[in-house]
Structures are given as C-alpha cells and as structure tokens.
Amino acid sequence: FRSMKRIILITTCALMTCASAFAQEDEEPKLVIKPTGRILMDAGVMHSTDETLDNQLNDGVAIPDVRMGVSATYGKWKAKVDVGYARQSLSLKDISLDYNFNKENLIRMGYFVHQFGLQSGTSSSFKISMEEPLANQAFFNSRLIGAMYVHAGEKFHATASVFAENDAMKMTTDKLGNEAWGAMTRLVWRPLTERGKIFHIGISGAYESPRYNKNAAISHKSYTLRAPFPTRIANVAAQEATISDAKALWKFSPEMNFAIGNFGFEAQYFYVGIKRDNAMPNYNAWGAYSNVRYLLKGQGYTYTKADAGIATPDPGSLE
C-alpha cells in the first residue's frame, strides 16, 4: 500500500511538472511582424482676398506623404519604424520601442509624438480632418526624441514625458549646440466611455527651454511659433512669430470630448507664456479650436482608451 502511495505521488509530481512545462511552452511569446503604410493625396482650389497670399496659395494636386514601415511585437515589447517619402526626399518618422508593464501601463522611448492634448494621441490618418487645427499647429510640438510613460486606466488616463528638441534628429551637437529639453504631461478623466455615450475632460502642461534657430544670434535664445494653412499643396504660413530674448516657455491646454449616439464634439484651448530676458516684456499667446462630427451611417461613436479620444468609426460607417 505504501509502495502504491509512492507510485501515485511520483506520477502526480511528474504530471504536474509536464503540465507546467507545457504551460510555459504555451506562454512563450511569439514574434509578430506587421508591415505598415499609407499614402496621402491632396487637391485643392484656393483663393484669398489678400493679394500677396493669393499669389502663394495656388491651386494644384499633390501626393505630399507616402509612408512605409514595420511594427514588431514580442511579449511585452513592441517596436515601430516608419519612414516617409515627400517632395523627392526621405525622412524618418516614428522610431519607438515600447515596454508594456501590463494592460494599463507602458513606457515608450525613441522618436515619436508625445501626448499633449487631443490631436497628439493618434496619427493624422485617424483624425477628424486631414490637417490639424491652426491653434494646434502653432502651439504643439511635432515628433521629439524622448521617453513617455503612459497609464491608460478605466477612468483615468495620464502621461509624463521628457524630451529633447526636434532639431536633435537633424544635426550633431557641434552644429546644434547644447540641445534644448523639456517635459510635458497629459491628464484625462473619462467617466463615460460606452458606445454612443462618451465624455472626457483633461488638461495638458509642458515646459521647454529655448530652441535652436539657424540665426546664431538668437539660437537657443528664442522660440518660433508657426501655423501653416491647412493644406499640403502649398506651404504658406497663416501665422508666424519668433520671440527672441527668451528664457523659458510654459504652456497648458484644457480639453473636452463627448459623444451622444452618432453626434460627437471635441474642443481644446491653448495658453502659452514665454519668460524673456534683457528687460523685454514677457510674451503670452492663446488659441482654441472645436470640431463637430456626425455619423450619417453607423451605430454610434466608440472610445479608445489607449489614445484617450473618440475612436475611428467602424468599418462601413459614413461620417
């Protein structure tokens, strides 16, 4: 009887060991590689009552952006490389490496768009309009080298980033000088995230040291705020300002997003303050935009918690 007990015990242990081994094999992460890409086409007829602008805003067609890239996932790791081709030249777009601690928390490192407000959460192919609002163009940053922590919880979304200036991707420091740096954060509260019943409010904040300028006299002593007209056919500034004698830039941006059934609305406000040196008056600027959207065909808007915003409409929808 004792011998039988030992045999049963040994057999049970062996089966448990085998089951554990098979479970480990099942849990072994797999490398998944996916190609990515898109083509952006634009056509337009433009007119301005300002004669100078009218001479610059010419009619035409363009293929201003062709993207090709690859993304790879392996367990808790995800990598992305995206290359753009525009106007007969290649440029690096997103180059990032993510580590997912769990379903709600990750850290991203590399060259990418850091979250600051509604427009920063997704790429241009997922936005309401093909081009971003002018206020966002003027006060937001493009892709930056840095690291970003993201918490995408059930009711609360938060990010925190540190970064170097955009020109760090274009020049070595012997030409660029000491790189400008900064930090930013985005905080969102989302009590309603059901289909056709969405509401969130949030606020973003950022600090930046003075940026590079090709004019050596004001390089890393100034900021340039620029917003082009919303077209890729012509690159014409709607607004532009260079603020010299600068010491630091602070900005904040409250946001709101809601949807009821097939109706959606989003709005964002920007405030920028620049502290200046040499007894120059400090510079302040503000801007805002709002977008209204409606599904002519569809079952109501949905919410994406990873990006904190209204998701791209379902396949087969008409917006």
Residues covered by each model-derived region:
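Extracytoplasmic loops and strand-loop junctions of Gram-negative outer membrane beta-barrel proteins
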Residues: 50-53, 128-133, 234-241, 275
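A short hydrophobic/aromatic micro-motif that marks alpha-helical segments and, especially, helix-coil
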Residues: 20-21, 168, 274-276
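Bacterial Sec-dependent N-terminal signal peptides
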Residues: 1-26
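Short, solvent-exposed loop/turn segments at secondary-structure boundaries
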Residues: 171-175, 278-281
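Flexible, glycine- and charge-enriched loops at secondary-structure boundaries
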Residues: 54, 285
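Outer membrane beta-barrel
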Residues: 26-48, 56-168, 174-211, 289-315, ...
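Surface-exposed beta-loop-beta
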Residues: 180-284
